[in-house]
């Protein structure tokens, strides 16, 4: 009888433990991975800002983990496979990836959906004011800083200059913005390309040692039907006075950094995250 009593107590105890555990399991947060970028880069700063934004951090339905990555293309691939739920990807990579037109990669990335615009990355081409360079086409035979190899700046410079037919006609120097500005100041470069927000510290640096000018890249793009072939680029103006000595508006174009999601992320989760004030999130960047 005592043995039966013990068995009954054990069974009741097990049932009670399961009953108490059930609500905990049901209320477990969904863990979401947000792909950022290399340490110190803007993509990773965005991912960290979203992870730590109080309304998202305090959600009872899900938790967000910012995960570093190589950047836009890796985020595209990881989000497409579901290894990341969200990520930051350039609109150009989203467009070309869906079309199967990425360089050396014909796979179609169709499970990546754009859910929000984050910020613009404008093209800027710096030359000396007295150099007689009025168009990107005038760079033939010149020494040009084209961005770090493997960077978005380098990729978009290659894309644009190849479209114009000058990529193989310039002396390319792959280097970061600050190094390019220093080389420009030492007369080792005739021009350098950036794909970043303005005002850029590198351009400010260059303007301290040289009278600089920015090239009207929008006109080159229009004349060559660049926007028709790559419609994800948008036009913009670098306002007069952004840099020392640049006293007129300079037309250009930009790509956009997008917040993207895997197609299988629940709609209510995406809606809830985007219901937060995105502007306030970006203030933390």
Regions found by a protein language model. Name each.
Residues 2-12:
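Bacterial N-terminal signal peptides that target proteins for export
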Residues 18-26:
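C-terminal segment of classical bacterial N-terminal signal peptides
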Residues 29-57, 62, 121-186:
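Bilobed "Venus flytrap"/periplasmic-binding protein-like clamshell domains
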Residues 29-96, 105:
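N-terminal (or domain-start) structured segment
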Residues 86-119, 197-201:
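Acidic, polar ligand-binding/catalytic clefts
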Residues 91-93, 101-103, 131, 168-266:
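Pocket-lining segment of extracytoplasmic ligand-binding domains
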Residues 266-276:
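Short amphipathic alpha-helical coupling segments at ligand-binding clamshell hinges
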Residues 284-285:
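Conserved small/polar residues in nucleotide/adenosyl-binding loops
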């Amino acid at each position: 009888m005592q043995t039966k009593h013990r068995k009954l107590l054990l069974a009741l105890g097990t049932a009670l433990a399961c009953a108490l555990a059930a609500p905990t399991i049901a209320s477990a947060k969904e863990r979401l991975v947000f792909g950022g970028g290399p340490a110190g880069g803007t993509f990773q700063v965005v991912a960290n800002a979203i992870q730590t934004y109080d309304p998202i951090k305090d959600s009872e339905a899900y938790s967000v983990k910012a995960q570093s990555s190589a950047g836009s293309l890796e985020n595209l691939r990881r989000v497409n496979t579901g290894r990341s739920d969200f990520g930051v990807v350039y609109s150009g990579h989203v467009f070309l990836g869906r079309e199967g037109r990425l360089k050396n990669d014909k796979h179609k990335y169709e499970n990546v959906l754009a859910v929000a615009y984050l910020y613009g990355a404008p093209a800027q081409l710096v030359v000396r004011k007295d150099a007689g360079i009025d168009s990107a086409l005038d760079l033939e035979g010149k020494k040009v800083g084209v961005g770090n190899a493997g960077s978005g700046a380098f990729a978009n410079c290659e894309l644009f200059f190849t479209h114009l037919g000058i990529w193989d006609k310039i002396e390319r120097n792959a280097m970061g913005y600050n190094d390019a500005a220093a080389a420009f100041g030492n007369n080792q470069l005739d021009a350098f390309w950036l794909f970043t927000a303005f005002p850029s510290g590198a351009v400010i640096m260059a303007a301290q040692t040289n009278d600089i000018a920015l090239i009207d890249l929008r006109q080159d793009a229009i004349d060559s039907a660049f926007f028709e072939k790559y419609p994800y680029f948008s036009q913009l103006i670098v306002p007069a006075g952004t840099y020392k000595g640049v006293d007129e508006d300079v037309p250009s174009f930009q790509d956009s950094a997008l917040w993207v999601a895997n197609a299988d992320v629940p709609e209510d989760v995406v809606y809830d995250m985007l219901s937060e004030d995105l502007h306030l999130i970006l203030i933390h960047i």
